[in-house]
A protein has these predicted regions:
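A conserved beta-strand element that flanks and buttresses the S-adenosyl-L-methionine
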Residues: 146
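Class I (Rossmann-like) S-adenosyl-L-methionine-dependent methyltransferase catalytic domain
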Residues: 17, 22-136, 154-161, 172-243
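Class I S-adenosylmethionine-dependent transferase superfamily signal
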Residues: 166
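Short, basic, low-complexity termini and linkers enriched in Ser/Thr/Gly/Pro
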Residues: 1-5, 12-24
Length: 243
């Protein structure tokens, strides 16, 4: 996204604050180039859903609606909290948070196609094109920064960079829903290698920020679909110790 476009957004929202290190080239990893191209467009077309369809997908896959899963972690979070989703695609997670009465919702998405398509699925949510490796916001600007099935697509060697940015931009909470395994494990993805991993992402945050974060809550969600039985996803909530 061009700096003048970001400046225009800043004029339209008192909550949008630029971070001085914004990069011009968003495709700075192999995975980013992959997701910004045709594969990412195809993913967006396959996975774009309206809210009811999205909740039905979660019920079929994990036995719970996404709104119920979110509420189990965020029920006590003030509804005026500023929330940023990194890698929001067309904004389904943000739309779910909006349904739960959160009002200050922001998303950063690498793929321009998904950002444009988000207009079909969301209203009143600020979604911009950008990279999770260089979030264009001031330190501690958000009350909560989250991912939903995004860290699983970041190469393990690059995870520290995106985690640094998430923690930098969060005043208090880091929240995630990701593919889980006790140890980092590569998984083939639609015939491609090097684009999907499962790991203990909450522990990776804790290891990277020793003494700075604490685990508030974590819950494992086993898949109930026959084709996915034995696999787990995890939702976790971390808090800055100094917050």
């Amino acid at each position: 996204m061009k700096r003048e476009e970001l400046a225009g957004l800043a004029q339209n929202s008192s909550f949008f604050i630029l971070h001085s290190s914004l990069k011009k080239d968003l495709k700075n990893t192999q995975q980013e180039a992959f997701w910004a191209g045709d594969f990412g467009r195809e993913y967006t077309d396959r996975n774009s859903r309206h809210l009811d369809e999205w909740n039905d997908f979660y019920r079929r896959t994990w036995g719970h609606s996404k709104l119920d899963m979110n509420a189990a972690f965020l029920a006590d979070l003030p509804r005026e909290s500023r929330i940023l989703e990194v890698g929001c695609n067309t904004g389904m997670q943000l739309r779910g948070l909006q349904e739960a009465s959160f009002i200050h919702l922001y998303g950063v998405e690498l793929q321009s196609y998904a950002v444009e398509k988000a207009k079909q699925y969301t209203q009143g949510i600020n979604i911009i094109q950008g990279s999770g490796f260089d979030l264009p916001f001031k330190d501690g600007f958000f009350d909560l920064v989250c991912t939903n099935g995004v860290l699983i697509h970041i190469a393990p060697a690059d995870l520290p960079r995106i985690m640094d940015e998430m923690v930098r931009c969060s005043h208090r909470y880091i929240w995630g829903f990701e593919y889980h395994a006790p140890a980092t494990t590569a998984v083939p993805y639609r015939g491609n290698e090097g684009f999907l991993w499962k790991a203990d992402y909450a522990q990776l945050f804790l290891d990277q920020f020793p003494g700075q974060l604490r685990l508030v809550k974590q819950e494992l969600y086993p898949y109930i679909l026959d084709a996915e039985r034995g696999n787990l996803d995890v939702m976790y909530l971390l808090e800055k110790v100094s917050a």
